[in-house]
Amino acid sequence: MIFDVIKNLFKKDENTEQIEYLGVDKDGNKIYEGYYHEFKGIPWVFNKTTYTREEFDKAFYECLEEHNVNHDNLPPLVEPEILVSYEAWIESKSQLHPNEYLYEDDELEEYDKEDGMWQVDIYARFKADNGQYFTTEEILFKIHNAMANKELGDHVFFENLAYDDHEFDADDADDVSDDDEGTPVFVVWLGS
């Protein structure tokens, strides 16, 4: 009996967090709290089209089918709200949506412009439609439409949506409120 207690003590990994299994979504995907899948292998190409959700889903599923990607294997992102960081070129702050903020919100200086645009890092806040988690389709739809009115250069191929940090330093972006600490931040990686 004492041997079993000692054995179990050494089996524990102090750095391992318990991941709570939350069940399955409407499509049968397993949902876990506090675990972030890699969002790689999704062959999406960002463009200037602003989609309705129905239009996006149709184009997205056609793209997956063309590249033999099974949409049933796309993982959910189990967070009710996230911040997404991405790089883009803008002509003015008016291109930012109400849920977007510049990482460095100091004045955009004329001398920093290149071909009439500024290269900026943008944070976008997204909330899950169901209040609990994002499907892969939902988060890519929201990211796509946020980027559609901005210039991405030749970096238009989706490579990954990678977890960056769980704490957000509100001092880095003046427009982000102090209650943002604890909101997970993800970075969109695009390739050419």
Spans of features found by a protein language model:
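Low-complexity, charge- and small-residue-enriched intrinsically disordered regions
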Residues: M1-T16
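Ordered hydrophobic segments in well-structured contexts
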Residues: L83, E138, V185-V187
